[in-house]
Structures are given as structure tokens and as C-alpha cells.
């Protein structure tokens, strides 16, 4: 992982925690909930969990949840929410690109919500996810849609894998992310031993977005 990556999230942890789920009640995301399905009694990993909003969602659905993140400060906020309202969530600091803290076949499912595009090495991350999943396990993730940014878009370097600096009006997101063509995600999921089961494109809510999908969700199962 790039040296600046943990520091980038540590730097925005306070603003991030106050902007997203400040009361610690858990994420509300119908698409994610549908793709996850019934997780009652299942062992779940919330990958790149940040301050724990996705972990709290999974716990509210009846799962036994472990949250993992590279950022010390993000996990500090996650721990505060857990202490204030215990849900039985365990938080671990580790790198999503190797998940060295976890043994093989530790989890029934892995969820990575709006973070996969911020992790430098996709192939090693997907390989780590596959390693910690049990037979028949699944991986649900969401990303900023790699194809569209607005209802009118000039495509210049879509086919290139590259790091880019976001221009954001908010102070609670790191400035850097990694653009990858949709085909890269498909190819590397396949190489990691996954079969894509569902893809859901969610359009922008802004009135001027013209219904263009801004987010992409997917569920992949071990082939």
C-alpha cells in the first residue's frame, strides 16, 4: 500500500466520521442490503470499514461482524461507536491488500462499500478477499461508476488504469483514487476465482445528472 494511504485517511477521519453516520446508527442503503441478503448468524468482514457504518449495518442484519481498516483514526471512531452502543463488532487494523491478520476461510461474506477504488492494488486485494472466504462465500462491493461522471462526459483516458486526484467540495474524502476500466474489475475478479452474480447501476440523484449511473454495485461468488 502506498505510504500516504493510511495517513490520507487518518487526516480526514474526524470530518469523515461527522459527515457519515455521526450518530452511529448504521448505514441505510437498500441496494447494499438487497445484495447482501440474509446474513443472520453469518461471519462477515467489512473491508475498509472506515468508522464502521457498514459494519453496523451488517450487525443490525444479524451477522457476526469484523471490521478491518488501515487507518488508526478511522478505527478509533468505529471503536467509540461500538463502546457507546455495543453490537458485538470486532475491529482490526490491517491492510486490505493482504489481510495478514486473518486465516484462510474465516468469513462467509465480505462487503466493501465505496472503498475499492481508493485501494492501490486491486489484484492483491481481491486475492486476499478470496483467501479469507469460505467455500461458496461471496463478495459485495460498490464503487464510483468507472464509466460516467455526468450526463455529458468527454472520455479521454478511460482505458488507462491510473491514479487521479479528485476535485471535491468536501473535506472528508481523501484526494486520491484509482480509476480502472470496468473490464479490469471483471478480469481481476475472474482471476481471483469469482463469478459475477449481479451488477446494479445506481443513477445520480441530482436533477442535472440525466439519470446517468454514478455508482456501481456488484455481488460476486466463488466460482
Tell me the role of every PLM-derived stretch:
Residues 97, 101-110:
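A short acidic, Gly/Pro-enriched loop at the edge of an enzyme's catalytic core
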Residues 109-122:
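A short SAM/SAH-binding and catalytic strip from SAM-dependent methyltransferases
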Residues 123-138:
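A short glycine-rich, Lys/Arg-flanked "PGG" loop and its adjoining helix->strand segment in the class I
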Residues 176-199:
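Short alpha-helix
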Residues 1-40, 53, 57, 74-77, 138-167, ...:
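Conserved class I S-adenosyl-L-methionine
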Residues 192-194, 207-223:
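Core SAM-dependent methyltransferase catalytic element
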Amino acid at each position: 500500500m502506498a505510504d500516504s494511504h493510511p495517513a490520507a485517511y487518518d487526516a480526514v477521519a474526524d470530518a469523515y466520521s461527522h459527515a457519515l453516520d455521526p450518530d452511529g446508527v448504521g448505514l441505510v442503503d437498500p441496494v447494499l442490503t438487497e445484495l447482501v441478503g440474509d446474513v443472520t448468524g453469518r461471519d462477515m468482514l467489512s473491508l475498509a470499514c472506515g468508522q464502521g457504518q457498514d459494519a453496523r449495518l451488517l450487525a443490525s442484519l444479524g451477522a457476526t461482524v469484523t471490521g478491518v481498516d488501515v487507518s488508526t483514526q478511522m478505527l478509533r471512531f468505529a471503536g467509540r461507536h461500538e463502546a457507546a452502543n455495543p453490537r458485538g463488532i470486532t475491529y482490526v487494523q490491517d491492510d486490505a491488500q493482504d489481510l495478514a491478520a486473518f486465516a484462510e476461510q474465516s468469513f462467509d461474506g465480505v462487503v466493501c462499500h465505496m472503498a475499492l477504488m481508493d485501494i492501490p492494488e486491486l489484484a492483491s486485494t481481491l486475492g486476499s478477499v478470496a483467501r479469507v472466504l469460505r467455500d461458496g462465500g461471496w463478495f459485495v462491493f460498490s464503487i464510483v461508476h468507472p464509466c460516467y461522471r455526468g450526463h455529458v462526459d468527454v472520455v479521454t483516458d478511460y482505458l488507462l488504469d491510473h491514479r487521479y486526484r479528485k476535485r471535491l467540495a468536501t473535506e472528508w474524502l481523501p484526494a486520491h483514487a484509482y480509476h480502472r476500466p470496468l473490464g479490469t474489475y471483471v478480469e481481476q475478479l475472474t482471476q481471483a476465482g469469482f463469478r459475477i452474480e449481479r451488477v446494479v447501476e445506481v443513477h445520480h440523484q441530482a436533477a442535472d445528472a440525466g439519470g446517468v449511473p454514478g455508482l456501481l454495485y456488484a455481488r460476486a461468488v466463488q466460482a
